[in-house]
Amino acid sequence: MKKMMLGNEAIARGMYESGIHIISSYPGTPSTEITEFAAKYDDIYAEWAPNEKVAVEVAVGASIAGARAAACMKHVGFNVAADPAFTASYTGVNAGLVLCVADDPGLHSSQNEQDTRRLAIAAKIPVLEPSDSTECRDFVKLAAILSEQFDTPVILRLSTRVAHSQSLVELCEPENVPNKPYEKNPGKYVMMPGMAKVRHSFVEKRLKDMSAWAESTAINPVEINDKKIGIIASGIAYQYAKEAVPNASFLKLGLTYPLPEKLIRDFAAQVEKVYVVEELEPVTEEFCKMLGLSVIGKDILSLEGEYSTEMIKKAILGVEDAVFTQDEQLPVRPPIMCPGCPHRGAHYVLKKLGVTVTGDIGCYTLGALPPMQSIDTCICMGASVSMVHGFGLADPEFNKKTVAILGDSTFIHSGITPLINILYNKGVGTVIILDNSITGMTGHQQNPTTGYTLKGDATNMISLEKLCEAIGVKRVRVEDPFDLDGFEKAVKKEVAAPEPSVIISRRPCALLKGVKFPGPISINKDKCVGCKMCMRIGCPAIVLKNGRPVIDSTLCNGCGLCKRVCKPNAIGTEE
């Protein structure tokens, strides 16, 4: 039977069919759905870990114990997981270990555009790169096999388009893969210097063996057509190139690290001109040039963003197809917090107070955009807490006018240790944890503070208050961000305090089931004075018509925040 599947769903299917029994992940676009789809299979144990480092360590432990395992994350998540991943490359595996890492060319939902192949090369971990959903399924199964055959973790590198595009996938029955017996082996699994030195030699030999395997594998196919143009491509870039220059000769790389030297040389010898088409970093291009081959790549193709069929066609053939354009372009719709978003109240107060805000990764990062513009920085998960300490060290005056904000899931991910750092080093800083009872931006995933597992089972719920108190924070308070006056007083008081403090801004995400508001809200035209204070909260339901604010009832969910900022009391709940 065949089924239309997202690339991410096909990966989950491949895990099921290949006998991968354990998956530990942290949600991150565009990788999130892999673990969510995998959780639907009864034969797979799937969990959300507090962060990617923990997820990879869980998967490594399961693999060494004898069960095929996987961990899934986005590209910046692999930075977090690098510590165990790099050393797991030395230890190798017992049962198959697959690391699914999704890159984000074009920065659809990320803070940078890094190429996972660079880290994989540094870690000496092989990389498989599918170009469609069928290959997603097939390559996961192959990854598990290669992992055991070559005693190595294997990275499955995705891109946003492969992860979120659909194509037909043939469904197969799952393999019966029993757990392998565990044998105590300190020389392999205890990476003290003496053992690690021996394992490093093993890793270098493993790469040579895999390079030899890459010379004849079916996932690196050669297609000779018109010999004037030869294209070496991988991943989604292969699909674009194939559509742009269908008559060209192709070397499609399914294994993008380590690369096959002889296969590439032989292909280049058969064509007049070689183009290397790869999104982001020129990894394959640099390898070809290292071999002394004359290839064309980033000198005509971009180092940045996503590719397209049109871009490649223009670059290689110099042909620019006529593209339909409208006489009038639709206005750009910027990303914005949802109607009823609990973070809106917190941002409104912080903007009003004029404090410096070190921000973090999540829905609340949108507070950096107009009209709020309350966030000053956004670097990575948990950085807000470390940076508020850094601000205070640079100038103690910042302690009186700077706060860190981060979400509940982000705090669990990477916010606890920097808060400990503030306490340990006698710092002064105010941390605001925006607790909306869910991991919001990646699509409502559970986390350790929600009380539910990935599969919806009730579990231990971590109390943010008790956690902060347990590490030594004496000033911990919970506030409702829609109580604007109370929230403002709390921020003023805690920022002025000469010691570390935590404000937990607690109100559930407006999109959660069970969250109810009083009802639709409207503006009384007779009372409205046109001050536009309600526009300052940035609610998409409030628009200007003829210079006066109007509430769009199709978008308004009745949260009532606009009522709280309206001084003339012109906004009220409809009868």
Kindly give the residue locations of the regions a language model identified.
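Flexible, low-complexity linker and terminal segments
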Residues: M1-N8, E17, P130-M337, P342-H343, ...
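Thiamine diphosphate
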Residues: M1-S133, R161, I224-N225, M290-I504, G514-V515
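Short acidic, glycine/serine/threonine-rich loops at helix termini
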Residues: I34-F37, V60, A81-A85, L107-Q114, ...
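Short helix-loop-beta junction
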Residues: F37-D43, A241-L251, K466-G472
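A glycine-rich helix N-cap at a beta->alpha junction
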Residues: D43-P50, T91-A102, Y182-N185, Y424-S437, ...
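Short beta-strand segments
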Residues: C72-M73, V98-A102, I155-S159, I232-A233, ...
